[in-house]
Amino acid sequence: MSRNGGSDRYRAALADENAWARARRPKCCKLANSPWLRRAVAGKLRLDWSPEQIAGWLKRTHPEDECNQVSHETIYRSLFVQARGVLKKELLSHLRSKRSMRRSKPVDPNGDRRGHIKDIVSIRQRPAVVEDRAVPGHWEGDLLSGPNNSYIATLVERHTRYVMLAKVAGKDTQTVVCALIKQAKKLPNELYKSLTWDRGKELTDHRRFTLATKIDVYFCDPQSPWQRGSNENTNGLLRQYFPKGTDLAVHSQAYLNKVARQLNERPRETLQFETPAERFNACVASTG
């Protein structure tokens, strides 16, 4: 009122004119004023963090210091609005592109189009404690596929969103199950209690996996990828590193471990901007 009044009272016309004048006045970008903040944002972008993750991380690590916080909108504007020129345009390549909508796949009128797997245990029989993500140790898995019969097994822990990747030499059930057994033996028993998979025939020999690891396997309903939501989301993130058409066989297990580590060190909004690594390491420590 005081900014928009006349000599003795509020004037609507003058208020409107003054408001537009203030809106047109150029404002200095927060990133331009703070070299530390600019370096911090650029460094996290180079690690493929999203602007939302960066903003959430800054707010969590500097809760009382607004000078060391910046909104994700400011980061986006600094990247996309050429006039600002605050963040280098080369950092644009580190933003994740939007996933295109998947085309629907033809469904076998008899049900599962991927073949019959014996002795499956349906996801509908999965204990309720798995559903609410309150207890760690329950994983979702899938195969990421590339040309020339190249595959990566992707595993995501539901409670912490922790990711593990395994190089797989083929899609046959013996090869896949062996790779999954090897990964399972790297973890404490308390942190690997169940695995949820789709109806892919690569897990036809799921009984051997359970016998070797004491890990229960549950299968999703046909054509229901949303029943492995964490894993589907992770596969989308992985396409930033492995675009469709990439021969996955050229990547070493060491590189897959590096990619998994990068994903696990990104803060997640769903974890109150903690990282999967922080949550998972706390779970490991609690096992003694």
Please describe what each predicted stretch is.
Residues 1-48, 52, 56-64, 77:
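Short, basic alpha-helical/linker "hinge" immediately adjacent to a nucleic-acid-recognition surface
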Residues 2, 43-110:
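Conserved short alpha-helical interface segments
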Residues 28-32, 36-37, 96-153:
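Mobile-element integrase/transposase regions
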Residues 41, 54, 75, 142, ...:
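Mobile genetic element proteins and their domesticated derivatives, centered on retroelements
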Residues 145-149, 165-189:
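Active-site beta-loop-alpha junctions of metal-dependent nucleic acid enzymes
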Residues 161-166, 219, 244:
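Short small-residue beta-strand/loop micro-motif enriched in glycine and branched aliphatics
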Residues 197-213, 219-242, 249-261:
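RNase H-like two-metal-ion nuclease catalytic core shared by retroviral integrases
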Residues 244-288:
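C-terminal domain-tail junction helix/linker
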